[in-house]
C-alpha cells in the first residue's frame, strides 16, 4: 500500500488451500460493490521448510516422486512454494484506461465441506461450484474447462471427481490440475492456478 500508494479495502485471507481463491472472490465482490475500481489479490506460501515438510509427511499424503492428479499412477501430493497476484479491475474502468484484459472473473462461490482435511466431502465442493455458476449467471453447460484442486491424493481426487460429476453430469468438460507443474503451494495455489488458466 505504501509503495504503490494504494488505498481502499485491505484484508488478509487465511483459509488454507482456498486462501488465494477466497482473496480473488472477495476482491471481485469489493469491485462489484463499488468499494474499489481495482484490487490486487492473490496468495503466497513458503512451505518448503523442515516443519512444513514434516507436518505433511506425518499425514502420509506426500508422493515419493511427482504429483499426478487424477492419474491411475498417482501416489500423493508434492509441496510447492510460490506466490501469485492478479490485478482485478472493473470492466468499464479497465476499458477507459485502455487496459489489455486477459480474462474475466465471472462468479465466485465458497462453501466449507465440514469433512476431513484428508477426505473432503464432495458436497462442499459441489455447492461451491454451483454457487459460482449462479453468481456468474451461467449453467454447467456453459463451462468449457474445469481447473480442479487436484492434489494427486487418492481421497481428494475421488472426492473432487464426484463433486464435478454431481455438478456437470456424466460428461463433464475437460478437467485437469496444474499442481503437476508447481506442486501444492497451499495458500498460493488458487492464484497460481488462475494465472495458469489465463
Where are these regions (language model features)?
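Beta-strand segments within the central parallel beta-sheet cores of soluble alpha/beta enzyme folds
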Residues: 11-15, 36-45, 100-108, 141-148, ...
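Conserved small-residue
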Residues: 20, 27, 56, 87, ...
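Stable alpha-helical structural segments in soluble proteins, enriched in small hydrophobic residues
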Residues: 23, 128-136, 167, 193, ...
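Alpha-helical metal-binding/catalytic segments enriched in His/Glu/Asp
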Residues: 24, 83-91, 191-198
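Short acidic, glycine/serine/threonine-rich loops at helix termini
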Residues: 24, 49-55, 115-118, 157-159
Amino acid at each position: 500500500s505504501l509503495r504503490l500508494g494504494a488505498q481502499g479495502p485491505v484484508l488478509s485471507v487465511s483459509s488454507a488451500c482456498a486462501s488465494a481463491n477466497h482473496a480473488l472472490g472477495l476482491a471481485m465482490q469489493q469491485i462489484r460493490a463499488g468499494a474499489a475500481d481495482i484490487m490486487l489479490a492473490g496468495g503466497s506460501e513458503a512451505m518448503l521448510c523442515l516443519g512444513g515438510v514434516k507436518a505433511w509427511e506425518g499425514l502420509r499424503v506426500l508422493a515419493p516422486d511427482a504429483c499426478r492428479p487424477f492419474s491411475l499412477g498417482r501416489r500423493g501430493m508434492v509441496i510447492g512454494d510460490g506466490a501469485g497476484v492478479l490485478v482485478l479491475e472493473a470492466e468499464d474502468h479497465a476499458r477507459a484506461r485502455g487496459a489489455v484484459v486477459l480474462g474475466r472473473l465471472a462468479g465466485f462461490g465458497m462453501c466449507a465441506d465440514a469433512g476431513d482435511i484428508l477426505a473432503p466431502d464432495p458436497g462442499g465442493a459441489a455447492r461451491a461450484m454451483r454457487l459460482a455458476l449462479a453468481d456468474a449467471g451461467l449453467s454447467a453447460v456453459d463451462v468449457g474447462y474445469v481447473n480442479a484442486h487436484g492434489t494427486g491424493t487418492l481421497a481428494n481426487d475421488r472426492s473432487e471427481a464426484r463433486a464435478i460429476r454431481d455438478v456437470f453430469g456424466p460428461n463433464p468438460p475437460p478437467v485437469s490440475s496444474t499442481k503437476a507443474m508447481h506442486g501444492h503451494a497451499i495458500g498460493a495455489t488458487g492464484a497460481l492456478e488462475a494465472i495458469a488458466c489465463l
